[in-house]
């Protein structure tokens, strides 16, 4: 198992967490442990890292990479369940939380996982291969209207209606089973002049992956739960990879910083809702030119940080 995954915005993310050597930190997306290994280097033996991942292969790879550290707790679970995970571990408060929302290099580069539009494989795209619906179920089971909705909303694809219609037409003849079968359907309906700026299947694959893994639905809850468990001055750092995720994080941080619901004309707040965090990054931190050139998967990444009041 080759779980090589180059962490994006590594230095910026570690700096953003303001790591205390005796603190407790949660990596909600452990992956290949690129970020976690750097966190551990800054922790004393009294410090603790809790690493969560819903991909069992990520957990196995991280255990191997971090085998020299005894202050790591590994949790095979979805970070949606962050609150119950911390409760089960009898952890009342933590000093920092990291979420890296990108698909790992391992997942993209392992054809049988079905994430990549560059390699042929059965349609799958499940982060946790042990449960949930797969990309095959979405492509072959959703109505045309539902396919249109997710490709439009989650992929921001201008040809979403044409793609949805073409998928339904194709599957009426026979099921769409593989990634490259789906790629061909997409390519056939997108005009050639619109196939120049990036792979034509990228947005549709993103949309289906988000649907399969409920990626956007779980973000708001996880951020809110995470902030509740932060110590004062503790930080939550979130790396996003597309505008939908970034918008959700930006909006949620703003809501937590200014939760007041009083009408603007009220001279003072009477709703009683107090700020929970201070937003550290008014504009997201993005990779520098060197990282963009040397790690193509970093190019769309953005880091946003908030600090518990």
Swiss-Prot record:
S-adenosyl-L-methionine binds at residues 33-35, 53, 79, 100, 107. Residues 290-309 are annotated as: Disordered. It is an enzyme of class 2 (transferase). One of its GO terms (molecular function) is rRNA (cytosine-N4-)-methyltransferase activity. One of its GO terms (cellular component) is cytoplasm. Residues 299-309 have a biased composition (Basic residues). Keywords: Cytoplasm, Methyltransferase, rRNA processing, S-adenosyl-L-methionine, Transferase. Pfam families: Methyltransf_5. Its main location: cytoplasm. It is found in: Cytoplasm. The keyword Membrane does not apply. NCBIfam families: 16S rRNA (cytosine(1402)-N(4))-methyltransferase RsmH. PANTHER family: 12S RRNA N4-METHYLCYTIDINE METHYLTRANSFERASE (PTHR11265:SF0), S-ADENOSYL-METHYLTRANSFERASE MRAW (PTHR11265). Specifically methylates the N4 position of cytidine in position 1402 (C1402) of 16S rRNA. This is Ribosomal RNA small subunit methyltransferase H. It comes from Clostridium novyi (strain NT). The gene is rsmH.
